[in-house]
Amino acid sequence: MAETAPAAAPAAAPAPAAKAAAKKPKKAAGGAKARKPAGPSVTELITKAVSASKERKGLSLAALKKALAAGGYDVEKNNSRIKLGLKSLVSKGTLVQTKGTGASGSFRLSKKPGEGLEKAPKKKASAAKPKKAAAKKPAAAAKKPKKAVAVKKSPKKAKKPAASATKKSVKSPKKAAKPKKAVAAKSPAKAKAVKPKAAKPKAAKPKAAKAKKAAAKKK
């Protein structure tokens, strides 16, 4: 029993060592936070230097480095950061490259950094307007069939004049038949008027008889 007790004590020793190892990363993380440089970033310094320049054609890379060095920035150590910062600002649209390619050349600020953001919503609003117009077009298209129904009704109206025309055509023979009756009625009257004219010579015969009687008396 006395021999096993000392063996248990070394086994319990690794547990405090593990706790100490777990605490060390926290201290390392705190050291990393302390290493971060306090103050503005490279991009902020570049934008301030470019905005401070009054050159119309833009600020060259050499002039930019001079301005950053005058502000206390270590240009030689952070040369690669300056180039990366310039490229990122050009890609975002905050800076415009007037000369050269890549990080070399001249740079100037865009007219208004917020213009790009303001124009985007306007484009979205203009894109939304055609949708509303497209929504109105189907409604107009739905109304058009009603006009087509009105056009279908119009042939019915056209049929009515055709029916009236047939009625008139039926009535017209009756009117044409009436003058025939009138002509037939007038012709007997003319015939009657002719007969009395023929009867006048018959009336002259008695006068001749009277003349013969008067002559006989004279004898």
Swiss-Prot record:
Residues of the H15 domain: 38-111
Region ranges (Disordered): 1-42, 89-219
The record lists its disulfide bonds as: none
Function, please? Histones H1 are necessary for the condensation of nucleosome chains into higher-order structures.
The record ties this protein, via InterPro entries, to: H1/H5, Histone_H1/H5_H15, WH-like_DNA-bd_sf, WH_DNA-bd_sf
Domain of life where this protein originates: Eukaryota
Which GO biological-process labels does this protein carry? chromosome condensation; negative regulation of DNA recombination; nucleosome assembly
Q: What is this protein called?
A: Histone H1.11R
Give the record's GO CC terms: nucleosome; nucleus
GO terms for MF:
double-stranded DNA binding; nucleosomal DNA binding; structural constituent of chromatin
Q: Where is the composition biased (Basic residues)?
A: 121-135, 143-160, 168-183, 192-219
Sorted alphabetically, which SMART domains does this protein's record hold? H15
Q: Which family does it belong to?
A: Belongs to the histone H1/H5 family.
Provide this UniProt record's keywords sorted from A to Z.
Chromosome, DNA-binding, Nucleus
Q: What subcellular locations does the record give?
A: Nucleus; Chromosome
Q: Name the Pfam families on file.
A: Linker_histone
Q: Where is the composition biased (Low complexity)?
A: 1-20, 28-40
Q: Which CDD domains match?
A: H15
Q: Primary place of residence?
A: nucleus
